[in-house]
Amino acid sequence: MSKYLLRRLLILIPVLAGISLILFTILAMAPGDPFEELATNPNVPAEVRMNLRAKFGIDDPIGVRYIRWFSSMMRGDWGFSFASRVNVDTLILQRLPTTLIVLGSAQLLAILVALPIGTMSAVRPYSIFDQIATTLAFIGFSLPTFFTGLLFILLFSVYLDWLPFIYRADISATGWRFYWEHLRQAIMPVAVLGLFQGAALTRFVRSAVLDVIRLDYINTARAKGLSEQVTIAKHAVRNALIPVVTLMALQIPTIFTGAVITEQIFRVPGIGSLLISAILANDTPVIMAITFVFSCVVVTLNLVADMLYGWLDPRISYR
């Protein structure tokens, strides 16, 4: 296990380097100028704009700019935001915890919804419960997150007035009231993301469990006298989770994409809203840093998924 993990970590180095090179090249070739706003300002002389471009190396060759950026990033210097006038790492560290909390809670909700419903649908295929669950699952992952987000706002914020529809970071409450207010305003973005992912995951859990419960070793476990609950939970579901874990790892980029949209709808001060603001302002250092952080998180979580295979199925050996 340790040798396999070390080998995978060493493989991540050229993978992340290649990802950073591709991202940097695409952003460098994309249209837009971070100093375009200064060009329309008559109070900023042309000499000042030229000096700024020379200082930040905007007109240097792409290869030179990439080497400079990558070496600076390895030293912990992620650049300077042209729009916010703040270091990029400071901006990301301010927003990243909020995004990770929302995404982690949404993924946990998706698992808590998908596992029991998908398993019960597989155990009782084509029953009334299975048909209702299948219908709701199809509706859940057919509706985009921006549409369900607007529906949630209309229902729970406008008509019922139960939940705030704008996420506020500057809550003045103290004590338990502070945590309660944060929980209330996080319910809708977490529910929108979690139910969307849970709907798709439910179908895959059902399919995976349905394939496993027809195998011979499940019939053998029943013949030994094990209860149906133990047979399904201990022997069927655990082995059926391997393709589900693979799917969850592959869906991580989709989750981040949904988070970008959801943060815009509910005004969540996370990485997604920061990325949209940086794109609109042509703030290349911030865009590059955020996309690279997303790539690192995706690659790391896929490595974690590979590690989970051995825990789910002890027959899998890491060499």
Question: Positions of the model-derived regions?
Answer:
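Alpha-helical transmembrane segments of integral membrane proteins
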Residues: 2-3, 96-129, 145, 158, ...
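N-terminal signal-anchor/signal peptide hydrophobic helix marking the start
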Residues: 6-16
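Phosphate-coordinating loops and pocket residues in cytosolic domains that bind phosphorylated ligands
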Residues: 7, 40, 93, 134, ...
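Hydrophobic alpha-helical segments of integral membrane proteins
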Residues: 9, 52, 62-78, 88, ...
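Residue-level recognition of pore/gate-forming positions within transmembrane alpha-helices
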Residues: 12, 42-43, 138, 154-155, ...
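Hydrophobic alpha-helical transmembrane segments of membrane transport/permease proteins
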Residues: 15-67, 160-182
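Membrane-water interface segments at the C-terminal ends of transmembrane alpha-helices
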Residues: 22-29, 71, 135-166, 192-198
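An internal, D/E-rich "acidic patch" concept
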Residues: 59-115
